[in-house]
């Protein structure tokens, strides 16, 4: 059996066991206090209510049945019942009498103690000395001797012993009670306020006992204020100055204060004065004509004189006299306009706080409002700056120039006391008529003044310490168009013409329109150079790669073919000779350039192979067709069937043998074959081979023509020369059977005589000689292979005069060679 309970804020129920079927409310509260550790129940109370019916059990004797669920909540405890004791007035009267007698005795004896201690209770933990004990004895003597209780009470209430013993009739449990009762609420204790101080308490303001200090009648009177001094810890005596109103106590008993630091104060004041301006430093344009001070809230008299004044000064003047300073009487105070420009100028000068002439000159720009009514035409004045001579130079004008207009703009630089070397610049406008009539005269005068101006002397400027910068003087510089021939360093730009003649602009492929006269940079040069009229009327002649007097760079001039070198190197792109002439192509990188270069080389090699291979094939085809036609001709005419061979002299045989043995000829034949690209060759070797091959191909026609002329001359002079029989025959004829060799020898001996001269006349065309040259090289290669395989003896190179060559043998030799070359090519 149990009772279920929980707080309202709890989630689960707790149980309290019980013995019977019922339990009282008081017993249930005690068990709840015990289980929840709520103390004895004196500080708080618990209200119990039914969880289902919300019925509160207010009576502690009320019975609660078992298995009931209740809710509990805490409430403040009930007020305690005070204990009231009966007072004994007789004992109190005796105590008061005893205390009154003791106060009289203590007041008389405690005077030396007050001299030693400035207040009672300062030395709280000292042992009472003999006079205090003597006063206690006197108090006991004054009390009745037969009353023991009175003596004990008097001993307990002795004021000298209040610091270590607390009376039973104290009004609060505070710790501070009895330790100098000068504070509110009985010192640092608390409780009900005590209006009557304890015996022996003396007010510190008036030195009268009977009241606390907060009840003293002298509160608020400065004559009774207590001065508190402190020791000058860490302060040297040299920095202390004795005064009656000091706060530091000196060893002599006087009081002192700190001396002011004059040096630091002067430095601070100097810093403040350096950032402020005096009234005399401001220009007169910023001062009010009435008060002679810097204008405050500058206002403009818009109806009369258009001058600026202080707003207060001019307003008071108009209200008092009903007239302006200039004498106009039709003005009102409402007609004044604020001069914003002047106000901003004054504010900037005051805020700047420095004496820089640059800042002052830029800020002190005063514009008179008369220019608003009569704005003069803006014109440049030809007067030079007054910085050179220190004097103002008037602008040149005509005699009939009117002087009715006042100067509209005056720019003055502030001349301060520490910057006395500044120069005032005044810029005056020029009349419109004077500008129109004398513009040319003024321009000439300005130019003459600029040219004839003496050298300026630099005047030293005395600048203050707070100045931020110096005024920079602009030096006159010549314009770019006035430069002549010596300054011809003009960059190569995209313009159509170059006025300084330092080469040609890109994109001018031989046509330039900028050379129809003498260029501006050529002072003193005539139209034609050294008698050359030039390709255009009055233009420069084409300089074929030659520099002219150090002015013209010897780089390409205009067209591509007019530059160095005159003969371009082999396999060079002519566009490379120009100065970036091929601008239509985009700028390529190094990789793209190398790839393009390799591709061009490969194309050239392919062209060379095709040209050489085509010539050889064409020559071989021609010879084969001729032989076939000779073989297939009519058998009636055997001589016409066999074409007469060309005359071959002994010189030709010797030249062939020398060509076979000479390394130059071998190298030339080696290069006639298509070049094989080797991966081991570097780029430099490949370029070198291509250049050398190009040179040999270029020299090959000349050598062929020269040899042909020699052969033609010899053949014409000696047409009946016998044909040498030492020509090489085919390898198959040399290894044939004896019957065939003897038959061939007989056939050769019966050959016909030499053909006429007209049939062997050489053809003068280069193609014919070139094809013959190719045939000879092919024949030599085949014979060389035969010699290498069959190891020919050196005796075969010797001539045998006994055997005469025949036409049939020579024709058979050539036919066999051609057929072998064709078979090898196929």
UniProtKB/Swiss-Prot annotation:
Subcellular location as annotated: Nucleus
Phenotype caused by lack of the gene: Increased tolerance to paraquat-triggered oxidative stress associated with PRMT13/PRMT4B, APX1 and GPX1 accumulation due to increased histone H3 methylation (H3R17me2a).
Alphabetically ordered keywords of this record: Metal-binding, Nucleus, Phosphoprotein, Stress response, Transferase, Ubl conjugation pathway, Zinc, Zinc-finger
Domain DWNN: 3-76
ZnF locations on chain (RING-type): 288-326
Catalytic activity: S-ubiquitinyl-[E2 ubiquitin-conjugating enzyme]-L-cysteine + [acceptor protein]-L-lysine = [E2 ubiquitin-conjugating enzyme]-L-cysteine + N(6)-ubiquitinyl-[acceptor protein]-L-lysine
Induction notes from the record: Repressed rapidly by oxidative stress such as paraquat, hydrogen peroxide H(2)O(2), mannitol, drought and cadmium ion CdCl(2).
Tissue: Expressed constitutively in both shoot and root tissues.
Example GO molecular function: ubiquitin-like protein ligase activity
Region (Disordered): 356-406, 435-488, 585-826
Residues with Phosphoserine modification: 278, 397, 800
Root EC class: transferase
Enzyme Commission code: 2.3.2.27
Gene Ontology annotations of biological process type: cellular response to paraquat; mRNA processing; negative regulation of response to oxidative stress; positive regulation of proteasomal ubiquitin-dependent protein catabolic process; positive regulation of response to oxidative stress; protein ubiquitination; response to cadmium ion; response to hydrogen peroxide
Biased composition (Basic and acidic residues): 588-624, 651-667, 680-706, 809-826
Chain positions of motif Nuclear localization signal 1: 668-675
CCHC-type zinc finger locations on the chain: 203-216
Biased composition (Polar residues): 356-365, 396-406, 435-454, 625-635
Protein's job: E3 ubiquitin ligase acting as a negative regulator of oxidative stress tolerance, probably by mediating 26S proteasome-mediated degradation of PRMT13/PRMT4B, thus preventing APX1 and GPX1 accumulation via the reduction of histone H3 methylation (H3R17me2a). Confers sensitivity to cadmium CdCl(2) and salt NaCl stresses.
Subunit structure as annotated in this protein's UniProt entry: Interacts with PRMT13/PRMT4B in the nucleus.
Designated name of the protein: E3 ubiquitin ligase PARAQUAT TOLERANCE 3
